[in-house]
UniProtKB/Swiss-Prot annotation:
Keyword Heme in annotation: no
Keyword Lipid biosynthesis recorded: yes
UniProt similarity note: Belongs to the LpxC family.
InterPro entries: Ribosomal_Su5_D2-typ_SF, UDP-acyl_GlcNac_deAcase, UDP-acyl_GlcNac_deAcase_C, UDP-acyl_N-AcGlcN_deAcase_N
Pfam family, one: LpxC
Cofactor(s), names only, from the UniProt record: Zn(2+)
Residues engaged in binding Zn(2+): H79, H238, D242
The protein, known as: UDP-3-O-acyl-N-acetylglucosamine deacetylase
Function: Catalyzes the hydrolysis of UDP-3-O-myristoyl-N-acetylglucosamine to form UDP-3-O-myristoylglucosamine and acetate, the committed step in lipid A biosynthesis.
EC category name: hydrolase
Stored Gene3D superfamilies: lpxc deacetylase, domain 1 (3.30.230.20), lpxc deacetylase, domain 2 (3.30.1700.10)
Organism of origin: Laribacter hongkongensis (strain HLHK9)
SUPFAM superfamilies attached to this UniProt entry: Ribosomal protein S5 domain 2-like
């Protein structure tokens, strides 16, 4: 059968919070089968477990943030969640000493490294997938996102920025993960922001830890990072990285085609809520034999 996965051993890293600017210690620990992804704020007097779920995403200002009914926050989780999706990890305890995960270099690659360093093991329980059975969509003005039935996992995403740096690169990417490696083609794409946004973010109490070391920074004309871009279309690739992380908040891999135009964290979360609200639009599935699994999931890296 296709098994659930967790880590072989705990692993710890430290970094800066993108929005808080706090120094954060992050520890990833193995979890039993059917646990899901559980966050723990170890800086609080009572470190309650927060199970990752779409219903708890209650702040989407520039990131995806879980907020419990009693106000405990766990923010900027999308890059870590994207890495977990890319490695097929189902069960994990995520301990953190602040209200957001560290930004690392602005991509998912450092999290991939951490997880692979810890090692990944299969567990004696079937991995559960969510298969989309009917189209589900969310639209707002000219922005939209959609999930459609598809025997695998594919992403088609387009962004639209009227800016010289963006006009030099493709702003649309179509990826079928049956033929594309998440680690090679998506994980290294970094978050990005504009210089003119810094003042606005500061008024919102956000972006205090941002720098050229953990984001692509763009002025009125150019990318300011000395080494430039990692991919010609790194901007839209990072949006795909974000979307994969946002979608994995549902707790299971999606067997579906995801597409979007000018979408972001808020719309991605609305899409998951719309899906879950329509029981006829989805089903849980498991697989007893690897040959029955859609080929998109054959590219998930072998166990470390």
């Amino acid at each position: 059968m296709i098994h659930q996965r967790t880590l072989k051993a705990p692993v710890t890293a430290s970094g800066v919070g993108l929005h808080s600017g706090d120094r954060i210690r992050l520890t990833l620990r193995p979890a039993p089968p059917d646990t899901g992804i559980v966050f723990r704020r170890t800086d609080l007097p009572e470190a309650a477990d927060i199970l990752c779920s779409p219903e708890l995403v209650n702040d989407t200002r520039l990131s995806s943030t879980l907020v419990t009914p009693d106000g405990v926050r766990v923010g900027t989780i999308e890059h870590l969640m994207s890495a977990l999706a890319g490695l097929g990890i189902d069960n994990l305890y995520v301990e953190m000493t602040a209200q957001e995960t560290p930004i690392m270099d602005g991509s998912a690659a450092p999290f991939i490294y951490l997880l692979q360093t810890a090692g990944i093991v299969e567990q004696p329980a079937k991995k559960r997938f969510i298969r989309v059975l009917e189209p589900v969509g969310v639209a707002e003005g000219d922005k939209w996102v959609r999930l459609e039935p598809y025997d695998g996992f594919q992403v088609s995403l387009e962004i639209s920025f009227d800016h010289p740096a963006f006009r030099l690169a493709p702003q649309k990417v179509d990826i079928d993960f049956a033929r594309t490696s998440y680690i090679d083609e998506i994980a290294r794409a970094r978050t990005f922001g504009f210089m003119y946004e810094v003042e606005t973010m500061a008024r919102m109490g956000l972006g205090r830890g941002g720098s050229l070391d953990n984001a692509i920074v763009i002025d009125d004309e150019f990318v300011l990072n000395r080494d430039g871009l990692r991919f010609p279309d790194e901007f839209v690739r990072h949006k795909i990285l974000d979307a994969i992380g946002d979608l994995y908040i549902i707790g299971h891999p999606l067997i579906a085609a995801f597409s979007g135009y000018k979408s972001g964290h808020a719309m991605n979360n609305q899409l998951l809520r719309q899906l879950l609200a329509r029981p006829s639009a989805w089903e849980y599935v498991t697989f007893s034999h690897s040959e029955d699994v859609p080929s998109s999931f054959h590219r998930i890296p072998h166990l470390a």
